[in-house]
Amino acid sequence: MSFALSDNFIEKYKRKRAPFGFNGLGELVYMRTYSRLKEDGKNEMWWETVQRVVQGTYNMQKKHIERYDLGWNAWQAQRSAQEMYERIFNMKFLPPGRGLWSMGTALTEEKGLYAALNNCAFVSTNNLKDDLSKPFTFLMDASMVGVGVGFDTKGAESFVIR
């Protein structure tokens, strides 16, 4: 069973104005960049994005705790998730942009592709002669979930293609 914030808690935020600031520019950037398209064809509102992100975070935490039998405390989780929601909604802290975009979506919830939460990654070409495809496979996989990938040139001229 997945984690969900209580309906009564969420109800308080549905009509509350988010403090985007910057004379409307903050909301414009949010709508363009982080608000996901819902099944009904409409974009998420801020309260929905925050709900998706917080629930996705606590789903990930719950899976980990239950997998290792660490003792999930539903009441404590609900309380701390509500505090997290409140702080994100009021922009006291914000997750990284990749977290706003990916957390709580099918990428993380169904496919387990938590790499999509990373902004960037690095791969070395130092051992190209041992495994020619490894750095390029990593680059492709990471790029496909939106991660920017940097690399070095240590493997340059370590083999000849004829």
Task: Provide a role label for each language-model segment.
Residues M1-R162:
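Extended catalytic cores of very large enzyme megasubunits
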